[in-house]
C-alpha cells in the first residue's frame, strides 16, 4: 500500500489487516490518494523530465499532457478512455488508474501513474480505509465497482499490455535503453534506509 505524501497512515490503512496479509505500507513524495499496489496486479510507470516540458501549464493541464500517450495506446487496444481531472484515467466501466506529480527543486517534474491490471477485492476491502473506517465495514462493492482493471477490459496478459505501452511511448517520443548505474543504485538504497524506510517518514503528520 502506497500512501500519498500528505496522507495519514491511520486514516488510510488498517494496519492489523495489512500485517495479516503481509502488505507493506510506504509513503511516497508525491501527493494524491492511497494506491493498493501488488506485483502482477498493477502497471506503473514514472516520467522524470525537465520542468520546462510543462512550463506555463496548470497542474491539471500538465497531468493530461504527460499521459496523453497512454490514452492513445489504450484506445488502440479498443478501450473508450479519457482523462478525468485532476488525475484519473477512466473508462466506461470505471477508473483504470491515477497519476501523481511533484515539481522538484532541481528544476524537474516527477510524474507517475499506477493502473489496475487486476484487483483482489477482499484484500483491498480489509486493508484500505476511507475516512478512518475500514473499507470492508462500509461495503467494498461500491469502490471495486468504480475500478475497471485492464485485465477485464482487454483480455490481454499483463506483459502484453506493458509491451504495447512501451511501444506506444517509443513511437511518439523515442526511446533509448539504459541501465541504472551501481552508484545510482547505491544512492537509492541509502535514501531508503536513511529516510523512506523509517517509521518517522511513514508516520509523519503532514
Regions found by a protein language model. Give the residues of each.
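Short acidic-glycine loop/turn motifs at beta-strand connectors
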Residues: 39, 92-93, 105, 119
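A short beta-strand motif that forms the metal-chelation/ATP-contact edge
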Residues: 89-101
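Short, conserved charged micro-motifs
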Residues: 12-13, 54-59, 123-125, 157-160
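Short gly/pro-enriched beta-turn/loop segments at secondary-structure junctions
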Residues: 84, 94, 108-110
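N-terminal lobe of the biotin/lipoate ligase/transferase fold
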Residues: 1-57
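Contiguous, small/hydrophobic- and glycine-enriched helical/loop subdomains that border
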Residues: 40-92
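Long, positively charged amphipathic alpha-helical accessory segments at protein N-termini or as interdomain linkers
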Residues: 67-80, 102-206
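Short alpha-helix boundary/capping segments
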Residues: 37, 58, 62, 153-157
Amino acid at each position: 500500500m502506497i500512501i500519498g505524501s500528505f496522507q495519514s497512515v491511520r486514516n488510510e490503512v488498517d494496519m492489523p489487516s495489512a500485517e495479516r496479509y503481509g502488505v507493506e505500507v510506504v509513503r511516497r513524495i508525491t501527493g494524491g490518494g492511497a494506491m493498493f499496489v501488488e506485483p502482477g496486479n498493477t502497471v506503473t510507470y514514472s516520467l522524470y523530465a525537465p520542468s520546462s516540458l510543462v512550463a506555463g501549464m496548470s497542474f491539471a493541464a500538465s497531468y493530461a499532457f504527460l499521459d496523453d500517450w497512454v490514452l492513445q495506446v489504450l484506445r488502440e487496444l479498443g478501450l473508450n478512455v479519457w482523462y478525468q481531472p485532476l488525475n484519473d484515467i477512466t473508462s466506461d466501466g470505471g477508473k483504470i488508474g491515477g497519476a501523481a506529480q511533484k515539481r522538484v527543486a532541481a528544476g524537474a517534474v516527477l510524474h507517475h501513474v499506477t493502473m489496475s491490471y487486476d484487483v483482489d477485492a477482499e484484500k483491498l476491502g480489509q486493508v484500505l480505509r476511507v475516512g478512518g473506517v475500514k473499507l470492508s465495514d462500509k461495503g467494498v462493492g461500491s469502490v471495486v465497482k468504480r475500478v475497471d482493471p485492464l485485465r477485464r477490459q482487454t483480455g490481454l496478459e499483463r506483459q502484453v499490455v506493458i509491451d504495447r505501452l512501451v511501444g506506444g511511448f517509443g513511437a511518439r517520443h523515442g526511446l533509448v535503453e539504459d541501465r541504472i548505474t551501481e552508484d545510482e543504485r547505491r544512492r537509492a538504497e541509502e535514501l531508503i534506509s536513511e529516510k523512506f524506510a523509517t517509521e518517522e517518514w511513514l508516520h509523519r503528520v503532514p
